[in-house]
Swiss-Prot record:
ATP binds at residues 14-19, 137, 171-172. Widely expressed. This is Guanylate kinase. The lineage of its organism: Eukaryota, Metazoa, Chordata, Craniata, Vertebrata. Monomer. Interacts with RD3. Changing residue 25 to P: Leads to aggregation. Increases in kcat with GMP as substrate. Its main location: other. The active site is at residues 44, 137, 148. Substrate binds at residues 37-51. Its EC number is 2.7.4.8. Changing residue 186 to Y: Increases in kcat with GMP as substrate.
Length: 197
């Protein structure tokens, strides 16, 4: 795939990835583009098909995975999630820096491709803070909350693995985390601005 170097943003649910990503895309709308992932889960209130996710059936997604149409895919809480090659190519075709929001399994899958992105992990300051954030969302059942927290603990440990991420941001303060994210991407932003992304 050609075009500007992509960015892989990862971290546990509730760490603030989506909030940071929305802010980045708003401030740099002509520079970054969001790779819209596919999922077999049901939409949450306010989510739009084709904007937040492509909501598809398990059968359709399994067929496309088998056909090699996905850069990465993973299963969480009985639902499939994945990034299609077409979604990344669509952003790159606009000469924008493609941002992929993926889980840890997705990061490992992408490492095995020729994509060569910048890997950034967004982590909560603690598991306790993360639990508070997830409870405030009020979108999880107790069972799914327990699963998310277990996955988050593994994610937080893996973020310390040498060489897995280029940058790890601890999101204790949204403004500070956003400043760190922009700093981590400053060279790519400058390159994209010079080439008229």
């Amino acid at each position: 795939m050609s075009g500007p170097r992509p960015v892989v943003l990862s971290g546990p649910s509730g760490a603030g990835k989506s909030t940071l990503l929305k802010r980045l895309l708003q401030e740099h709308s002509g520079i970054f583009g969001f790779s819209v992932s596919h999922t077999t889960r049901n939409p949450r209130p306010g989510e739009e098909n084709g904007k937040d996710y492509y909501f598809v059936t398990r059968e359709v997604m399994q067929r496309d995975i088998a056909a090699g149409d996905f850069i990465e895919h993973a299963e969480f809480s009985g639902n499939l999630y994945g990034t299609s090659k077409v979604a990344v190519q669509a952003v790159q075709a606009m000469n924008r820096i493609c941002v992929l929001d993926v889980d840890l399994q997705g990061v490992r899958n992408i490492k095995a491709t020729d994509l060569r992105p910048i890997y950034i992990s967004v982590q909560p300051p603690s598991l306790h803070v993360l639990e508070q954030r997830l409870r405030q969302r009020n979108t999880e059942t107790e069972e799914s909350l327990v699963k998310r927290l277990a996955a988050a603990q593994a994610d937080m440990e893996s973020s310390k693995e040498p060489g897995l991420f280029d940058v790890v941001i601890i999101n204790d303060s949204l403004d500070q985390a956003y400043a760190e994210l922009k700093e981590a991407l400053s060279e790519e932003i400058k390159k994209a601005q010079r080439t008229g992304a």
